[in-house]
Amino acid sequence: MSGRLEGKKIVVTAAGQGIGKATAIAFHNEGANVTATDLNDKTLADLNKEYPNINVQKLDSTDNNAILEFVKTLDTVDVLFNAVGFVHHGSILECEDNDWNFSFDVNVKSMYQMCKAILPLMIKQNGGSIINVSSCASSLKGFPNRFVYGTTKGAVIGLTKSI
């Protein structure tokens, strides 16, 4: 642990597994005060068992009221790392309206809601960083069998640039 992030307060969404978990651990190992959120109680409990100094909080990132209540518990946030995501497999012809809506709710709307809720804290403290995880499926080369996933991750890029 280098301590480079000592005293920094970092929120990581979808921290129960994958990129979110690895990022929460990396920030913790650099000395940050990490709050790891996820919808899955078991993966959060496993993370907390392995890293008891990481604060874990169950949070449905698609529930704006839950997000607003969660943010009320925070005094400052130096970094928001939005890792929440869902991969729908299928082409445009295999994408139903409910697949489209669910994917946008998870991959775009949840990030918008987290950014909107946490940004006032960052403005109040005169700084902070927001990192929204996207994918090369959105820009470098389209993936026809991940039609809606690539579309939503393209929207994440636009969202992030527009903040």
Predicted regions and their residues:
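Active-site loop-to-helix junction immediately N-terminal to the catalytic Tyr of the SDR YXXXK motif
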Residues: 95, 142-150, 162
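Active-site helix of classical SDR
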Residues: 115, 152, 160
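Conserved NAD(P)H cofactor-binding loop of Rossmann-fold oxidoreductase domains
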Residues: 84-88
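Substrate-binding pocket helix/loop in short-chain dehydrogenase/reductase
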Residues: 91-92, 96-104
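The beta1-alpha1 cofactor-binding region of Rossmann-like NAD(H)/NADP(H)-dependent oxidoreductases
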Residues: 58-69, 97
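Residue(s) in the substrate-gating loop at a strand-loop-helix junction
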Residues: 135
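Conserved glycine-rich cofactor-binding loop
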Residues: 16-17
